[in-house]
Amino acid sequence: MNDTTAAHRLREQLKRFVGIIFPHVPKLQKEFLGQMFFGIQAGQTTVLSRIARELKEDILLKKTEERLSRHLLAAKLDETVQDAVLAHGAAYVHDDTIVSIDPSDIQKPYAQEGGMPLLAKVWDGSRGHVGDNLGYNLCFATATPSMSRRIVPLRMTMWSAKEDGFTSENDKVLDVIGKIAEACGKLGIYVYDRGGDGNWLFDFFIAEGLDFIVRLVGDRHLLHWNGKRLAADLAGDCEMKYRQRVTFKSHGRELEVPIEYGSLPVRLPDHPGVELRLVVVKWPGSEKPMMLLTTLRAARSRRSLQQVVEGYLTRWRVEETIRFVKQAYEIEDVRLLRYDRLKAMVAIVLAVAYFAMAWLGLREKLAVLADHVKRVSRRMFEVPEFFFYAIADGVCRLFARHGRWNGLDGPDEEPEDPCQLELALQ
């Protein structure tokens, strides 16, 4: 397969993606989404003027940009796109699928209040509290199918602490989890970092009947056979029955560390009738063990405990996914002066990431095409560490250099070789 054929097949797949994921969207809005998906990937950008430039239309660039800007204001566009992606992605979620929930943000360090709509102070990870940086909050949710290293984006919701009706970040996160649970039939194992060590989250999970793995801070009281005790004290007394070496990525580095782990039966004081397990993990050099509270009550054998430990470590790969989405499509460079447009753009970027990660990256029928896209990326750069960087870079090169977007129903530039054309249409 040559690059021209690959680019043609990619455009055809993008058309199919729009048609299948958004079957009930009006035709004009569907055409707009196709243009945005193509332009964002061809330019790896969320800046409207650059997206318009990648469309290469036979009209003034300004007119293309103005049209895209108008369509971004369509009523409930963000909800339409978010719900469509989630409805399709729910098919990847089963009983043992890890559903990772990770709050993040869009930092606008050079923006000033009044320059962009509803800018608010966001979390500063280096300081451990809300700092002086302005921006918007995100909640990113992904699914990792069992026995797979691939990641499926499910939802990426943006909000501002200054928007009308805002109550708390916790309520926003619970709204995201609730919509995922409804779409997935309450399947999956929900994984949350230490920020989820709060009654607000445990009450919700238990009330909704959802399985979870949540990392504890250690200062929470739990019920054990010998009464109420701090989680950290219970962890110190836990027998480490099993040992193994695990490999995971953290902060861009692949680490292999020896760990020891064990578990204890516990209950929450507010929910004494719900049986839980406290899984304790220790590794060399750590000051205190990692404590994971889970509903997976069978977490006693090596195999079942390993599922809990690896399930939580899978959540750390979401950090790579968030970096991929932010860097590959420059989402933090977004420049829009209406809040509704900002939310719609974030939803559209989610759909673009879903096209690259789930539509191309996970489907066996498109394995040959995805492999060629990765090879295009390798020719231009060193092999990217993260699989989806290779996909995004390859799609960018093929879209930008071979043909242009001619609409969902418009004629496409076909490969010159008839044999290649036949392959492209299979």
Model-derived segments and their meaning:
Residues 8, 50, 60, 113-116:
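Noncatalytic, typically N-terminal accessory segments of nucleic acid-processing enzymes
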Residues 17-79, 145:
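Short, positively charged, Gly/Tyr-enriched micro-motifs
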